[in-house]
């Protein structure tokens, strides 16, 4: 999640009302439990996998420099064909830089980057997404190889709608190219 002046802008939607399904074998059919509805990439068209064996490695955190990075490759199943995917965050007083450096064993499908928000989303120009939430304005700049799409997610569950309102939004940045190595900033 990314907060600006104590206001969440890019969010984790949280868990809806607990039901039998939440604790059963079908829990990962619930959208809030799926990595596609978190601020994570789909690699080679494959989402991050659930289960304790799927986790990031080589995490680095330096609070003084305000940086964090992790290799998230092992959080994805074998069919993602990902050798290495280093996601890095660098925070300064005016911006958060997210960088993805990756190496795939094979490029099978275009990658996509997902971001969830509850704010008003607009696309003022190519390469730019604007999000406004409770008086806070944030701009997400993205590389030209991506096309931005917006999905509206209706919140019928009061446990979610009481926090975020009637709907939230998934911003998806989709690249058209299939490359075995690269980086996104």
What is each residue range found by the language model?
Residues 1-21:
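Internal mixed beta-strand/loop scaffold within catalytic domains of large alpha/beta enzymes
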Residues 15, 20-185:
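CBM-like, beta-strand-rich accessory domains located in the C-terminal region of large
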């Amino acid at each position: 999640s990314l907060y600006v002046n104590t206001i969440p802008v890019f969010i984790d939607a949280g868990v809806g009302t607990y039901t039998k399904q939440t604790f059963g074998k079908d829990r990962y059919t619930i959208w809030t439990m799926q990595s596609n509805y978190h601020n994570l990439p789909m690699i080679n068209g494959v989402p991050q996998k659930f289960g304790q064996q799927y986790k990031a490695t080589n995490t680095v955190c330096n609070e003084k420099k305000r940086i964090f990075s992790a290799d998230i490759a092992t959080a994805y199943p074998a069919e993602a064909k990902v050798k290495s995917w280093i996601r890095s965050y660098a925070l300064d007083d005016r911006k958060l830089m997210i960088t993805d450096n990756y190496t795939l064993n094979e490029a099978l499908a275009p990658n996509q980057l997902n971001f969830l928000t509850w704010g008003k989303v607009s696309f003022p120009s190519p390469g730019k997404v604007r999000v406004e939430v409770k008086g806070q304005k944030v701009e997400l700049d993205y590389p030209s190889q991506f096309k931005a799409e917006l999905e509206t997610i209706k919140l019928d569950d009061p446990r979610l709608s009481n926090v975020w309102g009637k709907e939230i939004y998934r911003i998806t940045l989709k690249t058209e190219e299939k490359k075995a190595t690269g980086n996104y900033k």
